């Protein structure tokens, strides 16, 4: 699955077709849980919502933080990297060659992805809504 927005949609459809790769390309998905539940690995920016969703679904991830977000995305990505759930690459270094270099061991050694997925177990789960209700109700 490749989410790309409107600008690159036609180029990506043709590119995957030319390469003989069976990919589903979407400009947008409202039901992201369908995409996440069918994923073994995600390549993503590192916005707070994306990081939260990826952590919720416990999907190994390669983050390419958006460099113009005042380092917020890098900070978000490093949280999962430090736990062993993510690989982080700076956008300046991100290209087809660097992605291939990162992907090859992940594709050829299933233990790497398995260990990345297991590393999510070490991340505490917070239920912010429930905690807020518990704090507010006695008032």
Question: What are the residue ranges of the model-derived segments?
Answer:
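Donor-nucleotide binding loops and adjacent catalytic segments primarily
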Residues: 1-41, 74-78, 91-99
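Short glycine-/small-residue-rich Rossmann-like dinucleotide-binding loops
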Residues: 5, 47, 65
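Conserved donor-binding/catalytic loop of nucleotide-activated donor transferases
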Residues: 37-39, 53-64, 83
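Short hydrophobic beta-strand element within catalytic cores of glycosyltransferases
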Residues: 44, 60-70
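Acidic, glycine-centered active-site loop in nucleotide-sugar glycosyltransferases
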Residues: 57-58, 74-86
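C-terminal "capping" alpha-helix adjacent to the active site of nucleotide-linked donor transferases
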Residues: 83, 87-90, 94-111
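A short, well-ordered alpha-helix in the C-terminal region of glycosyltransferases
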Residues: 105, 112-126
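C-terminal alpha-helical cap of glycosyltransferases
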Residues: 125-139
């Amino acid at each position: 699955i490749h989410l790309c927005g409107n600008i690159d949609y036609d180029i990506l459809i043709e590119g995957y077709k030319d390469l003989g790769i069976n990919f589903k390309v979407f400009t947008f998905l409202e039901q992201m849980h369908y995409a996440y539940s069918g994923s073994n690995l995600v390549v993503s920016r590192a916005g707070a919502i994306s990081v939260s969703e990826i952590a919720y679904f416990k999907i190994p991830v390669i983050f390419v933080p958006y460099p113009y977000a005042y380092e917020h995305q890098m900070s978000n990505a490093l949280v999962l990297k430090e736990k062993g759930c993510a690989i982080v690459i700076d956008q300046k270094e991100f290209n087809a060659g660097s992605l291939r270099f990162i992907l090859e061991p992940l594709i050829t050694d299933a233990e790497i992805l398995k260990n990345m997925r297991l590393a999510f177990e070490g991340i505490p789960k917070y239920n912010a809504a429930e905690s807020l209700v518990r704090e507010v109700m006695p008032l």
